[in-house]
Design a protein with these regions (language model features):
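C-terminal-most transmembrane helix of multi-pass membrane proteins
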Residues: 2, 41, 45, 142-143, ...
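Helix-helix packing/entry segments at the starts of transmembrane helices
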Residues: 11, 40-43, 80, 84, ...
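Hydrophobic transmembrane alpha-helices of multi-pass small-molecule transport proteins
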Residues: 52, 73, 113, 122-144, ...
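Glycine-/small-residue-enriched transmembrane alpha-helix faces in small-molecule transporters
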Residues: 1-43, 150-177, 197, 201, ...
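Alpha-helical transmembrane segments of compact multi-pass small-molecule transporters, enriched
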Residues: 47-51, 102-116, 131, 194-198, ...
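Specific transmembrane alpha-helical segments of multi-pass solute transporters/efflux pumps
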Residues: 19, 23-24, 53-103, 139, ...
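Juxtamembrane helix-entry segments on the extracytoplasmic side of multipass membrane proteins
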Residues: 5-9, 34-42, 64-70, 142-170, ...
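Transmembrane alpha-helices of multi-pass small-molecule transport proteins
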Residues: 29-82, 109, 167-174, 189-208, ...
């Protein structure tokens, strides 16, 4: 059984990347046929809240103090409200391929914020990674600005998708201690509940104005995919992989999402992928790889302690 665990973990990580990669073209197509970005976000947070709360009935119960419940409201603001609103509305404006490439930039934002907030050191690898990632992002944005074609990209959509990654990186940096205290199901059931409470008062009138009778069934299937696979199962598969495999191995699967998204989007005609975008993608991917491979503060501290121990006992 133990021999199968790494294989299962790898399969789960691949599935989560594939689920999220398909979510961009699937969600984009849904927003072209009957619903828009605010509708999709509303369905996603409500569906996620229902699924995670139902699942929590069959998992180990965790006591959450009232003060932490309110902390989850703030966490949900960054991780879901700002993140998903920015990403989904950005996806509605730009191409699925650009949006998926932008999602891989999150580790770069997380590194910069860790330096500012958590005082993590910046190594030369991290600095080079940030420069490469920024160069790639600038190329994508400039390509969108001069294209005049939504299938190539849209500058405002690209910026919104990038701001979504900044929002999620802020969530990871500001709520690191809170996240370490609870299981994924406890974290997500409270954050999705708060996200629903915070988003729906502003979107319910828009959702109710949907001409449901004329929305094609395919749009509802696509919305269901975003909720079930792109949200619920994607998070669970990632959790299984993270519990078994090293972070450096997990980080490799970050690239499954854009590869799946770009391939499917181009095949079905939702995006056009040009040479400059390919160069930009390589820069972003390489930058993220350098950031992820760099040593953290804990790694450096352990190395220093090890050297000190060796000197004392030499």
């Amino acid at each position: 059984m133990d021999n199968k665990r790494p294989l299962i973990a790898h399969l789960c990580l691949f599935c989560s990347g594939a689920f999220w990669g398909l979510m961009a073209p699937v969600g984009k197509d849904a927003m072209l046929h009957g619903i828009d970005g605010s509708d999709l976000v509303s369905f996603r947070v409500l569906g996620g809240a229902i699924l995670f709360w139902l699942t929590s009935l069959f998992t180990k119960k965790e006591h959450v103090p009232v003060k932490d419940i309110f902390k989850f409201a703030a966490a949900g603001l960054f991780a879901l409200v700002f993140n998903q609103c920015s990403y989904t509305i950005g996806l509605n404006m730009t191409s699925p391929s650009n949006s998926s490439i932008m999602t891989t930039s999150m580790p770069i934002f997380a590194m910069v914020l860790s330096f500012l907030i958590l005082k993590e050191p910046i190594t030369w690898k991290k600095a080079l990674g940030v420069l490469m990632g920024c160069a790639g992002a600038v190329i994508i944005i400039m390509t969108s600005a001069t294209a005049g074609n939504a299938k190539v990209g849209n500058i405002w959509g690209d910026l919104l998708c990038m701001s979504a990654q900044l929002s999620f990186a802020l969530y990871l940096s500001l709520f690191k201690n809170l996240l370490s205290k609870y299981s994924l199901f406890t974290i997500n059931k409270w954050m999705f509940l708060w996200a629903t409470v915070l988003i729906w008062p502003f979107t319910i009138s828009h959702v109710m104005s949907i001409d449901f009778a004329h929305v094609p069934m395919s749009t509802w299937w696509e919305t269901g995919y975003v909720v079930l696979f792109g949200t619920y199962l994607g998070y669970i598969c990632m959790m299984i992989g993270q519990k078994t495999l090293r972070p450096t191995v997990v980080s490799v699967y970050n690239y499954v999402q854009p590869l799946v998204s770009v391939t499917v989007s181009v095949i079905v005609g939702l995006a056009v992928f040009k040479g400059m975008q390919a160069i930009a993608a390589i820069l972003v991917f390489s930058g993220v790889w350098l950031v992820v491979k760099s040593k953290s503060k804990n790694d450096i501290d352990k190395h220093d302690h090890s050297l000190a121990y060796e000197k004392r006992h030499a």
